[in-house]
Structures are given as structure tokens and as C-alpha cells.
Amino acid sequence: MSKLSLSSLDKTNLEGKKVLVRVDFNVPLNEDGQITDDTRIRAAIPTIEYLINHSAKVILAAHFGRPKGQVNEKMRLTPVAARLSELLGQNVALTNSCIGDEAVAQSNSLSNGDVLLLENVRFFGEEEKNDLEFAKKLASHADMYVNDAFGAAHRAHASTQGVTNYLSPSVAGFLLEKELKYLQGAIDSPKRPLAAIVGGSKVSSKIGVLDSLLDKCDKIMIGGGMIFTFYKARGLDVGKSLVEEDKLELAKDLEAKAKAKGVELLLPTDVVLADEFSPDANSKISQIDSISGNWMGLDIGPDSIKVFQNALAECKTIIWNGPMGVFEFDKFADGTNAIATTLADLSAFSEVCTIIGGGDSVAAVEKAGLAEKMSHISTGGGASLELLEGKTLPGVAALNDA
């Protein structure tokens, strides 16, 4: 699905034009209202700077938190406007509301190269309902549209889909274009062997991905809390480890499917057990057939790490989604950190394409200080999963075809 991108527009298309850009500025704040991680803001800078440098008037639309269709003073974009001003080295004004006469007057008064941030679009319930009247009001700010919010591209909302009915051209920004290139490319035309590492606590949240990847991958490695549902389905004792009792048949089916399709499905052979869910818990390493009593598995074990590393060394494209254990606790972060280091090394020294597919695995890679070493780090959690599942993203489908 090839979409028109911002790179196809030059100064003749952009000079003096008001461009509505949907960005993903849903960043974490601490209790003092300060941004603790500005990755998403920095990710949008190339698109914004391209528009500034081509003399466009830039109008940014973003959501923040879940204000449930009402103004919530704690969810205003004030800290975002301040951080963006610092990163761009120019003032970014913030409107009091994303629609209305006052906001439109502000967008109409912009000079070429100016940047205006519209207040939180989710202060209006119509945003998430994809209300076309609301979309029309948002669109009235601008002459054309750029979607650079991959993290929200799986939502059919007014600012991601509705506005494209009223603005032309509607194109992909650089971040969205890069996400599609890597994630879609890894699924449609990867360098092989292709491996996926799927982690996280629940099979239920990764069913679609695992199912879809079984049709695409040469190898799949599974880690995280979800492994215990597979073990229990095999009839093993898992102690007090997390298990989704209603997904045991599904786990059996996935193993059978992998076998039938000739996909190498690797599950850990040993795990790190804890006597309680705590960073200071007593821990021990155990083979998967020796778990019992009050122990719970919180990480993959050292033997499994080696097996996974050897399997990954043979691959040319690797997608990673979900941690191997409770990496927030240092004691149970070894599996996740080892995978992160392995991928960074393969990326750097073996020209392997490494894609970190959103969510907790991104946090783990950043915590390990290895983000720069990966081929691609996805900014979208749900959007990455849906793309890997082979679903069409509404925010992408709505853009003009190339």
C-alpha cells in the first residue's frame, strides 16, 4: 500500500500553505507536570523542520492522555509546546482550544515558517467518534494534511481519518513513512531468515500477531509471562506463574500450527523463579519441568538466552515485540537485556535488520541505552501490533495513494 509522502512535496507545493500535521505527542509526565521522555516529540521534528524550511505555516494537532471528551487542565499541551519550542529553537504558540473562531484566527495570522500547536483534540468527544462536523472544523485551519502520528494511525478518529475528507493532498510524514517502510517491509519482503521475538505477559494480547507471524516467519521465539500458558497446556506444573486458563487450547493450537507450517517455535527451557512478585524476591534458576509450589517465573533463564542468541545469529531480519521478563525489576531483567544487546550487536556487525515493535520492548532498549544501535524503533504500540497482524490502519488508508 504505497501512499503519497511529504518527501514528494517541495517548496512550490508548500510555500505559504497552511499544513495541518497530526503528530503523536502523548508523552509521559511526572507529578510536577514535567516531561520524563520526549522521544515522541523528537520523532516528529524532521517533518516539522521540513515544513518550516519549505516556508509552510505549520499547524500541529495532537492528543494527550484520556480526558474523555472534556477539558482537563492536567492534560493541556502546555509542557509539550514548551519542549517543542526548545527543540525547534523558535516559539510554538498553543491555542486555548483546537477548534473555534479564536483558534482559526491564530492559524490565519501565521507567517511562513511559524508553528502553532492546537490544544488537545481529545477535549472533544467528537474526536474519537470520528465526527465529520468536528473533522471539518479541524480541517478549516489548513490547506493540506500530513499524518505523522503512527502511534494513532490504527484509530479511525477525526484528526487521523475524518480530516482527510476535507484536505487535499493528505500525505504521510517522514516518521509514518519510515514506520511503514520497516514494519510493512519486514512482513511483505524481508531478508531471510526472518525471526520474531514475542514477549509480554499475556497470550491474549498477542494472539493476532502470533497467528499472523506463523505465516511469515522462519523462526519465532516466545518469552515473558505468556510462556507459562504454553507450559501448562503441555501439562507441566508452573507453580504460581501467570497463566491464562482460558487460552490453553489456543496455546496448543499455536504450537501445532507452527509444526505444520515448518516454523521453528522456540520456548525457553529454563526460567528464573521468584518466591514473590517483588524486586527483592528470592530467586533461583529452574528447568521448566521442575517448577513447583509457591514459585513464579519472572524471566527466561541463562540456557534459554544462549539458545535464543544462537537462533538469532542465523537471521537477517528480526522483529521484537514484548519483554522476556519483568525487566522493571533489575533482578529479572537479564533475559530482556541479553536480547537487546544481541540485537544491537547483530545490527552493528552483521547488517541484520532489527525492528523493535513498540511498547515495553522500546522502553527496555532505551533503558539499556541501545536504541541508537537498532535499525528501527517503532513509536506505536497498538499500531505496530495491528500492522504486524496484517491489518489495514485507518489513518494510513485515508491518505492519498502515491
UniProtKB/Swiss-Prot annotation:
Indicate the transmembrane segments per the record: none
Its family?
A: Belongs to the phosphoglycerate kinase family.
Task: Give the catalysed reaction(s), semicolon-separated.
Answer: (2R)-3-phosphoglycerate + ATP = (2R)-3-phospho-glyceroyl phosphate + ADP
Q: Does the keyword ATP-binding apply?
A: yes
Where ATP is bound, by residue? Answer: K206, G297, E328, G358, G359, D360, S361
Q: What is this protein called?
A: Phosphoglycerate kinase
Tell me which stretches of the chain form a coiled coil: none
- The top EC class is transferase
- Keywords associated with the record: ATP-binding, Cytoplasm, Glycolysis, Kinase, Nucleotide-binding, Transferase
State the oligomer form and interacting partners: Monomer.
Which GO BP annotation is one of this protein's? glycolytic process
Q: Where does substrate bind?
A: D24, F25, N26, R40, H63, F64, G65, R66, R122, R155
Which organism is this protein's natural source? Prochlorococcus marinus (strain MIT 9312)
